[in-house]
């Protein structure tokens, strides 16, 4: 069973990385500005999904723990990218794009916290809804 978790995380990681790459290319087709919108949007979606997953899906035992780990660590872990965020910020600073770099860092941190909060709130709301309907966690 221990080997299975590595396979699940690996496959989910491949799918997350491919999803990030495809979504990044798609956003770049429509966004031709200095601000790194693709990475920001991908990371914000990832913050929401991880918070929702760990709050709702994991507590409801809807999926086996191995699948939840695969989605959280594998898919969402490879879908989001702190390293790209960091490199893009340094590139903006090196090109003297100070205001864009500040906006990017601010939106990433505050937006990530807000999206995580929304994901948690949605998960918590859905759990309470199921409990009031008589369902069990």
Swiss-Prot record:
GO biological process: cellular detoxification of fluoride
Membrane-spanning parts: 4-24, 37-57, 62-82, 100-120
Regulation (activators, inhibitors): Na(+) is not transported, but it plays an essential structural role and its presence is essential for fluoride channel function.
InterPro entries: FluC
Top-level division of the source organism's lineage: Bacteria
Membrane topology: Multi-pass membrane protein
Chain positions recorded as Na(+) binding sites: 77, 80
A Gene Ontology term for the protein's cellular component: plasma membrane
Keyword check for Metal-binding: yes
Subcellular location: Cell membrane
Function description: Fluoride-specific ion channel. Important for reducing fluoride concentration in the cell, thus reducing its toxicity.
Listed HAMAP family: FluC
Record-stated family: Belongs to the fluoride channel Fluc/FEX (TC 1.A.43) family.
Name of protein: Fluoride-specific ion channel FluC 1
Source species of the chain: Bacillus cereus (strain ATCC 10987 / NRS 248)
